[in-house]
């Protein structure tokens, strides 16, 4: 017998940056940037975080700058 699919619409995630009216994403604000990085140190995609395209681009630039300055790790050794 074929299984029936139970589908429901997933609630859209809210853009944290737009919701909190953050105009400038500073690379020195590591607490904000850590919200958008996985435990392995990878940048989380938009579909996971719910950020808009423009804010995701700004986040990516800020995270990469923070990594180069040594404020954030490139990879995490936690297992």
Swiss-Prot record:
Q: What does this protein do?
A: Binds as a heterodimer with protein bS6 to the central domain of the 16S rRNA, where it helps stabilize the platform of the 30S subunit.
Give yes or no: UniProt keyword rRNA-binding.
yes
Please give the Pfam families that the UniProt record associates with this protein.
Answer: Ribosomal_S18
Record's GO cellular component terms? cytosolic small ribosomal subunit
Q: Name one GO biological process term.
A: translation
Please give the name of this protein. Small ribosomal subunit protein bS18
Q: Which Gene3D superfamilies match?
A: Ribosomal protein S18
Indicate the secretion signal residues.
Answer: none
On the tree of life, the source organism's domain of life is: Bacteria
Give the Gene Ontology MF terms in alphabetical order.
small ribosomal subunit rRNA binding; structural constituent of ribosome
Q: How does it assemble?
A: Part of the 30S ribosomal subunit. Forms a tight heterodimer with protein bS6.
Q: Which UniProt keywords apply?
A: Ribonucleoprotein, Ribosomal protein, RNA-binding, rRNA-binding
């Amino acid at each position: 017998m074929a299984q029936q699919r139970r589908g429901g619409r997933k609630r859209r995630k809210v853009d944290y940056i737009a919701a909190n009216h953050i105009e400038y994403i500073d690379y020195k604000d590591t607490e904000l940037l850590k919200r958008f990085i996985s435990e392995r140190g990878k940048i989380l995609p938009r579909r996971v975080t719910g950020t808009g395209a423009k804010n995701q681009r700004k986040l990516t630039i800020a995270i990469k700058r923070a990594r180069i300055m040594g404020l954030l790790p490139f990879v995490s050794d936690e297992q």
